[in-house]
């Protein structure tokens, strides 16, 4: 049996291009309805510009949902808690600056790293964060800046990820 070029269209489906073949079509992107962070490529991102570029290249649809950090804040939950005791009055302002600047930098790197609250009491401060590692790193930073400090870590039993750090000025 011979085939000629004049046979006309075959019953085979038309060739598909790369996007049709390998990209799965409508991929949902998640945007936090509270802070505006966007979830794509398996991570939460600040940079909406990256999303806009990808959206033009592919066929994506946006879905709105709270990111894990905003959800924790809404539910009054935390993963990191630092209790700072015996704070000298003359160091309170500097300590506040260290905490806010360190957590702001962490947030700029990762939108899920957040300072939830600083509760200032008579004898101690309670700092809560959305990530346990952020609390550990913040305690290390406080020790590095102020030197004469005792730091004690305690971890909640499984399945919880909560870390509680006690920082005490000498």
Model-inferred region functions:
Residues 2, 23-24, 31-34, 38, ...:
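Long C-terminal interaction/binding lobes of large macromolecular proteins
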Residues 43-46, 78-81, 138:
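Generic domain-boundary/flexible-linker signal
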Residues 9-12, 59-64, 95-98, 105-107, ...:
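A short linear-motif detector with a strong N-terminal bias
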Residues 73-134:
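Extended interfacial segments that mediate partner engagement and assembly in macromolecular machines
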Residues 1-75:
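N-terminal cysteine/histidine-rich coordination modules
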Residues 44, 125, 165-169:
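Tryptophan-centered motif/residue detector
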